[in-house]
Swiss-Prot record:
Gene: rpmH
GO MF term set: structural constituent of ribosome
InterPro entries found in the cross-reference section: Ribosomal_bL34
Organism of provenance: Gloeothece citriformis (strain PCC 7424) (Cyanothece sp. (strain PCC 7424))
GO BP of this protein: translation
Similarity comment text for this entry: Belongs to the bacterial ribosomal protein bL34 family.
Domain of life: Bacteria
Pfam families cross-referenced by the UniProt entry: Ribosomal_L34 (PF00468)
Protein name per Swiss-Prot or TrEMBL: Large ribosomal subunit protein bL34
Keywords: Ribonucleoprotein, Ribosomal protein
Cellular component aspect of the GO annotation: ribonucleoprotein complex; ribosome
Length: 48
């Protein structure tokens, strides 16, 4: 039987693509803005 090779960690996921991390940079804010415009229920990983 094969092993699962991709096992993500919650801490890294939040640090890389959490809401507060996105808000720190201009491009990150653009990501949030685009997701708001599209009407996404979850704007980032750490929300919802």
């Amino acid at each position: 039987m094969t092993r699962r090779t991709l096992e993500g960690t919650s801490r890294k996921r939040r640090r890389v693509s959490g809401f507060r991390t996105r808000m720190r940079t201009i491009n990150g804010r653009k990501v949030i803005q685009a997701r708001r415009q599209k009407g996404r229920h979850k704007l980032s990983v750490s929300e919802g």
